[in-house]
A protein has these predicted regions:
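Conserved Class I S-adenosyl-L-methionine-dependent methyltransferase catalytic core
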Residues: 8-21, 25-29, 33-34, 39, ...
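Conserved class I S-adenosyl-L-methionine
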Residues: 165-175
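Conserved SAM-binding loop of SAM-dependent methyltransferases across substrates and taxa
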Residues: 176-181
């Protein structure tokens, strides 16, 4: 990765959180899946997502600024990447991984980073993985979202590694076996 030289590059890092949250919010309300049906208006997206129209406008403006959706003469449309990776049920969909694991499990932990670096957090505050797996609901959420996030990299690996002669496979990950499937 290139070394940063401009103030704007530092700002991009600082404000990336807002873009991520807009992405997670759009996934949460099914905006990309709604747009997979075809171009839409803010009014039709409001009906599709259950959000007030002015909030749809704000969300779509943020997503358009990042290139995740686009405004065309036909209306609001998904970008090719959103169609491929963020539409529920799409072949390469990993929206649940982003929405659930990154958005709901990992992002809240980022609020602890100052205390973690300073060493001022208690053991209970830093025991997230142990807590997740002791709670059946959180463990299921973690496993399902991790599976969704592993399917894409597994497909990428398969494109790069010829396994046509393989007779056995040892999965040492201990998860849902997304790479094996």
């Amino acid at each position: 990765m290139a070394v940063l030289t401009e103030a704007e590059e530092i700002s991009d890092i600082a404000f990336a959180y807002m873009g991520s949250k807009a992405l997670f919010a759009a996934l949460e309300v099914g905006l990309f899946t709604g747009l997979a049906k075809g171009p839409a208006t803010e009014a039709s997206l409001a009906k599709e997502t259950g959000l007030p129209e002015e909030r749809v406008r704000t969300l779509v403006t943020a997503l358009t600024g990042m290139g995740v959706v686009q405004r065309t003469e036909n209306g609001i449309e998904n970008s090719p990447a959103a169609d491929a990776f963020l539409v529920k049920g799409a072949k390469y969909d990993f929206g649940d991984y982003l929405r659930l694991q990154v958005g709901k499990q990992m992002y809240p932990l980022m609020d602890q980073i100052d205390g973690a670096l300073a060493g001022t957090l208690s053991t209970e505050e830093t025991a997230s993985y142990a807590q997740w797996f002791s709670d059946p609901t959180e463990a299921r959420l973690y496993s399902e979202s991790q599976h969704a996030g592993s399917v894409g990299p597994a497909r990428s690996l398969l494109k790069r590694v010829d396994l046509s002669e393989a007779k056995t496979l040892l999965d040492v990950g201990g998860g849902t076996a997304a790479f094996d499937i």
